Amino acid sequence: MRARSRAALLAAGSCLMLAAAGCGSGSSSSQSVATAPAQISGQLKVYAYEDGFTPGYVKSFKAQYPKVDLQTQAFSSSTSALTKLRTGSVSPDVINTCVDENAAEEVRLGVFQPLDVSKIPNWKYIDPELKKLPGVMSDGKVYVVPVDAGDGGIQYDPAHVSPAPTSWKDLFDPRYKGEASIEDNPVTAIDIGALAIGITDPLHMDSAQLEQVKNFLIAHKSQFRTWWESDTDEEQLYKTGEIWISSGYRDNAFTVTKNGVPNNFVLPKEGQLEWTCGYGISAHAHNLSAAYAMINWYASVVAETYEANTWHYRIANLKARAQLPHKILVLSGNNQKLSHPIPASEPSNYAEWVQVWQDVKSG
């Protein structure tokens, strides 16, 4: 699984380009989700991580928009999703994307169309800090509405890892050689390596610092049993006892524990990696009115509250966040002020990072 200031309306030129697809002027229209939800109908294709359309989650959307035929397709990784989107093997209306993966790249490649936020009433409740993250907007236009977020930290099995880890350096502790894992993601892995060797601002590393991180990760490659690729992959590694400690997320630790294997989560002192995910509308969307309705629903109080209660995600809607019970605030981390949050987003020299990570895995 796994961010997004901006213009309130589309520029007139963009609107002209999208006129055939139903772009509005920013005022209420027949396509506005706030005007006539009962009139919104037709097939709507959503391409997302599996949790983006679990039955309990989308139940309220289906009740609100009974004439919409919701068709869903899941992807397990952002890399495979982007490949399918670029080759045209999938043709969704609404697409799930994450800042720590490839949201900014998808925007650059034209996967998304600019959003008319006047058709997304819940946009005004979205945390302003999340609106600033890469991939949410580009050249003054909004492309992605962030809806959920989470802390990247360390997961561990308390039966095997003691005392509790406090630092990213603990992933490289020789006591856990062969029992550790890091997410197979260039941004995540390189951020962790940088923080472990004392680089405090990994997103702005120069080439010399990147080389330093690469050499460190290669030197410690035998520490790691594997690089985990998906949430399911990581959860299974804990279930089978193949790993004791890993980079991971608060919600993953909750899921592992719920499935019978005690699993704890901590925020390392050097910095916390923050993932943020959201939704955009495909540049080739066929059902714009339903797509806007879906994105507005994803950002709604009811949907956001479900995410916090069910998966213990941080949520983007400030109105929903203010209504959470204290227990859920704590479990989801929505009450926590982070000491050194690091947006898990693509750096400006992302291609160089990708090459470094490839070198680490093949080195």
Segments from the language model and where they lie:
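C-terminal motif of bacterial Sec signal peptides marking the signal peptidase cleavage site
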Residues: 18-22
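Mature extracytoplasmic/periplasmic domains
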Residues: 277, 282-341
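Extracytoplasmic ligand-binding site segments that recognize negatively charged/polar headgroups
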Residues: 48-55, 91, 96-242
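Early extracytoplasmic/lumenal segment of secretory-pathway proteins
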Residues: 33-105
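A ligand-binding cleft/hinge motif common to bilobed small-molecule-binding domains
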Residues: 101-105, 244-262
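Periplasmic-binding protein-like
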Residues: 210-220, 228, 259-283
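Bacterial signal peptide processing site
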Residues: 24-27
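Conserved C-terminal helix/tail region of periplasmic/extracytoplasmic solute-binding proteins
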Residues: 338-363
